[in-house]
Amino acid sequence: MLADILRATTSICAAFQNGVKEILPVASLEEAREMKLKGFLVASEQDGKKLDWADFGNSAFNFTTEAIGGRTLVYCTTNGTRAIEIAKSAEKIAMGAFVNLSALAEWLVKENKNVVILCSGWKNKFCIEDSLFAGALTAKLLNYPGYTTCCDSAQASMDLWKVASVDLLSYLEKAAHRHRLKKLGLDDVIPYSFSTDTTRVVPVYENGVIRDLG
């Protein structure tokens, strides 16, 4: 499964919560722009900023029911959709965020398969928020029978989560992407992005399309 907490997987969950029909992730801005010319709704950003020709940026608050309900949305972001491209050989890729943490864990347990958590990071670099989510999800899965891990990165992410979860929003003041969004005036989505279990959707990428399987 994939985590891009700020902001792609959180925003994808919000889109399905508000009634989007399906999401078509694309890896390049050129492909996204071509889809726009074909009449699709397009959400696209670069380095956090909405592109002028796109209908939406990458904020969960963009995706209201009025804007996307019942529609197909093309999606291209700096980190999230590129991570999907990296992982697309997997049979299924679930989209994980704090907003669907429990629903996602339950879905993964029902799937009864090995779980790999891919943190999208920032331009192929480590980021705090995705690793915090990985720790939260790992800790939750380990409460279910049959789940174990001897992965150092999983253990480290759980340790990070244990420290940060005492006061998550305060801890996130350290996060580099938190400051990037603040400089762009886009940090209004921070509290929402770290709210736990506000939706039961489980967006899953399969055969080139993301649909809600929750």
Ranges and model annotations:
Residues 16-25:
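Domain-level signal for Mg2+-assisted phosphodiester chemistry and nucleotide/NA-binding surfaces
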Residues 46, 115-118:
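A polyampholytic, Gly/Pro-enriched intrinsically disordered region
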Residues 120-130:
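Phosphate/ribose-phosphate-bearing ligand recognition and processing surfaces
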Residues 55-92, 106, 111-112, 128-214:
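Long, charged alpha-helical interface segments
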Residues 1-3:
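Short hydrophobic beta-strand that contains or immediately precedes a catalytic carboxylate
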Residues 77-78, 97, 117-121:
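Short, structured patches in soluble enzyme cores that scaffold and shape functional sites
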